[in-house]
Amino acid sequence: MIFKETKLQGAFIIEPEMLIDERGAFARTFCCRDFENHGLNGNVSQCSISLNTKKNTLRGMHYQKKPYAEAKLVRCSRGFIYDVIVDLRYDSSTFKEWTSIEISAENRKMV
């Protein structure tokens, strides 16, 4: 997996490395060790899927305070997502900054 830093402290664009052969393709989408090597929480406590039945569906911001804070990994298995990240961590050097990325089934990016 290739981790690319965003302008936000601790937020990455993650691109899986595709292994392709005559059978098709394989890619790792999560590895605890890789996440921890980039300062991310590798302890997965939940995995969820969201299905939007209409185009242009808007979903809300997700926010948790300590001790309930969660690391998130967002990917798109069909269509595309315009994902916005806002840094609301008071102790962060990028507090109140934001960034966005288009994530799609085609580009395989995760954030």
Question: For each predicted feature, which ranges?
Answer:
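Short, intrinsically disordered, charge-balanced linker/junction segments flanking boundaries
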Residues: 108-111
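Non-catalytic, conserved peripheral segments adjacent to functional cores
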Residues: 1-106
